[in-house]
A protein has these predicted regions:
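Fe(II)/2-oxoglutarate oxygenase catalytic core
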Residues: 1-119, 125-158
Length: 158
């Protein structure tokens, strides 16, 4: 874990699992990634306790490919619709292409390392962006998750 806002778990997937996902995608084969979704939810539940809330359903895992030809905007993005944004880095053999996170308004940012198989999850309201990939291809899986009010939670006034 890096900090409480941006969390990195190395070896979430093995290099072999990542290569399998990339190669199947390149060959046009669809994959059932349910086991990865379940593993993500397990990690979130193990690392966070949500008083009065529970994790909603994980959005569909999207396979994303970035190249030097991808059009990039270096403006900071924010997603206020979800609670967490989740990225699984499938490879690290490309130049630049860093996920960057603005943690305060003085333009200093945290840059997550490029590590094959790592899981990065962060609060979706954090300003974030991707620096341009300068060579080769960057492959990730990306999804989001919302929090739902827990039906079992009893609200009380103190």
């Amino acid at each position: 874990m890096e900090n409480k806002k941006i969390n990195i778990i190395e070896n979430f997937l093995s290099k072999e699992e990542c290569d399998y996902i990339i190669n199947n995608h390149k060959n046009g084969k669809s994959l059932d990634l349910t086991h990865i979704s379940e593993k993500i939810v397990e990690v979130l539940n193990d690392n966070f306790k949500f008083r009065g809330y529970e994790l909603g359903d994980l959005e569909h895992l999207l396979f994303k490919e970035y190249t030097p030809k991808t059009k990039y905007s270096l403006k900071w993005n924010v997603n206020n619709e979800s609670y967490f944004t989740i990225i699984v880095q499938l490879n690290d053999n490309f130049d630049n292409g860093y996920h960057q996170y603005l943690l305060n308004d003085d333009e200093k940012y945290f840059q997550s390392p490029k590590i094959t198989g790592s899981l990065v999850f962060f609060f979706s309201n954090i300003k974030h962006r991707l620096s341009p990939v300068e060579s080769d291809f960057k492959y990730i899986l990306e999804t989001e998750i919302k929090l739902l009010e827990s039906p079992e939670f009893k609200k009380t006034l103190i």
